[in-house]
Design a protein with these regions (language model features):
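Conserved N-terminal beta1-alpha1 strand-loop-helix module at the mouth
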Residues: 1-92, 99-126, 142, 152, ...
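Short, glycine/charged-rich beta-strand-loop motifs at protein surfaces that mediate ligand recognition
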Residues: 137-141
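Conserved cofactor-binding/catalytic machinery of classical short-chain dehydrogenase/reductase
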Residues: 149
Length: 210
């Protein structure tokens, strides 16, 4: 299984963009494109539906050594051997999420300011999502942070930080130039004509030495 510290490209499998029946194919395409870890985000689905899907997807991701993270519902980690859970600002505390999971899992947290990122690390987050960097339909209520805060957040916290929000191959170079080492991509990846090819192009920018 890949270590979090080695992960650079975080693929978000958002069922707002992908049909539940297409989720396994998209997951395999992400893996073919060398995505480092994958999050299942299913805001409009029941916990039972997510449990069933996460179980199927985990067979695929675990065989490839790619961690699978579930969004919001820490209790799913008690039923499916996923590697982690991801929390928003309005979700459970990290301690409560770990208790619900009932075992050691990675716990990440979405943050929308430097202060929230610092607090998430203090609370014990294994990684943070930092954004939205650019305007994005997945976070319409949040003002874009822009590029200027990226370097500062990397200077202030030590846990892996994944920049997120409106990041696509066309602006990824700007995000990296602003100090990002890791990114999470949602619609850019999911809407790509060839998901694997798109992911590989992103990884080439994130890992120029390879």
């Amino acid at each position: 299984m890949r270590n979090l510290s080695d992960c650079r490209l975080y693929g978000i499998l958002d069922l707002g963009y992908v049909g539940i029946d297409d989720a396994e194919r998209v997951t395999k395409s992400m893996i073919d494109g060398d995505v480092d870890l994958i999050q299942l985000r299913a805001k409009e689905h029941s916990v039972k539906e997510i449990v069933d899907l996460a179980g199927k997807l985990h067979q695929v991701t675990s065989a490839a050594g790619v961690p699978l993270i579930v969004n919001d519902h820490a209790e799913i980690a008690a039923k499916v051997p996923v590697e982690g859970v991801h929390l928003g600002q309005d979700d459970d505390s990290l301690a409560h999420a770990r208790k619900k999971a009932g075992r050691h899992v990675l716990v990440g947290k979405s943050t929308h300011s430097l202060e929230q990122a610092v607090e998430a690390e203090r609370e014990g987050a294994d990684y943070v999502g930092f954004g939205p960097i650019f305007a994005t339909p997945t976070k319409p209520d949040y003002q874009p942070i822009g590029l200027t805060g990226i370097k500062r957040v990397h200077n202030e916290i030590t846990v892996p930080t994944f920049c997120i929000g409106g990041i696509k191959i066309d602006n990824l170079g700007q995000v990296i130039a602003a100090g990002a080492r890791r990114v999470a991509i949602v619609s850019g990846l999911l809407k790509a004509p060839n998901i694997a090819k798109y992911a590989r192009a992103c990884k080439a920018l994130l890992n120029p030495e390879t």
